[in-house]
Amino acid sequence: MANEHAIGFMDSGVGGLTVVKQALKQLPRETVYFIGDQARLPYGPRPAEQVRTFSFQMADFLMAKQIKMLVIACNTATAAALPALRQQLSIPVIGVIAPGSRAALKASHRNRIGVIATEGTIRSNAYRDAILTKDPTATVVSQACPKFVPLVESNEYQSTVAKRVVAETLKQLKKQDVDTLVLGCTHYPLLRPLIQNVMGPGVTLIDSGAETVNDVSAVLDYLDIANDRSTKRYPDEYYTTGAADQFEAIARNWLGQPDFHAQHIDLGSEAND
């Protein structure tokens, strides 16, 4: 395997760019190939089997580009497809749930941990199981936040509407007295200032995607597949199954890249199922 090959990142939409942003900062010599399945989001309400199917379609697309590692930059897809992808693919596959769970336990002082995520991730109990396996004494309070992803995907995440929706959604969770809150969806860091404002300064927010890049770095070193050139060999590539201009508008702002460009692609035929 050529060390100069890209790392593949995949998500249901633009949320995975929160992971990419950290990767660009932490691993500047690594080439990024990213695909966001905006045509079929949100993944949260979908059955796990369907999410697995979509995940394999994205993985196949990236594998055809000879990536050296796959990062499932989506909590719902990690919960539904990580074991199957690891079994089927010949390259390292990294999800976002285990790194986020470890970071939450490390940050929590009173072992009262909140998890906010999509319906699919909450339904899977993936975070609860990961946290309690490591520390059975922990208390885990989970809440699905189905309105958050649409706010981000419609580029409304800094709006007054977003502020109101976040406050209303987290009203009950705030009463649960958690000291640490896992942002269990890679879209949610774009709402981080609003979430922090509602939960208060005493609650530590855990960005599971950002924590995942630490795992990516460790695996690159362990397997000796990090790019050892002084610069990237190949340019980064970004793909969306949705509208490229909408994807670009969010990405340019979030990544701070005014010349950011994305390409539209089609995957499968189940966009409206």
Swiss-Prot record:
GO biological process: cell wall organization; peptidoglycan biosynthetic process; regulation of cell shape
Biochemical pathway: Cell wall biogenesis; peptidoglycan biosynthesis
Reaction equations catalysed: L-glutamate = D-glutamate
UniProt keyword Transmembrane present: no
InterPro entries assigned to the protein according to its UniProt record, in alphabetical order: Asp/Glu/hydantoin_racemase, Asp/Glu_race, Asp/Glu_racemase_AS_1, Asp/Glu_racemase_AS_2, Glu_race
SUPFAM superfamilies reported for this sequence: Aspartate/glutamate racemase
Keyword annotations from UniProtKB, A to Z: Cell shape, Cell wall biogenesis/degradation, Isomerase, Peptidoglycan synthesis
EC category: isomerase
Binding site for substrate: 11-12, 43-44, 75-76, 186-187
Pfam families documented for this protein: Asp_Glu_race (PF01177)
Active site: 74 (proton donor/acceptor), 185 (proton donor/acceptor)
Gene3D superfamilies: 3.40.50.1860
GO MF: glutamate racemase activity
Function as written in the Swiss-Prot or TrEMBL entry: Provides the (R)-glutamate required for cell wall biosynthesis.
UniProt record similarity statement: Belongs to the aspartate/glutamate racemases family.
Protein name per Swiss-Prot or TrEMBL: Glutamate racemase
The organism of origin for this protein: Lactiplantibacillus plantarum (strain ATCC BAA-793 / NCIMB 8826 / WCFS1)
Gene name per UniProt: murI
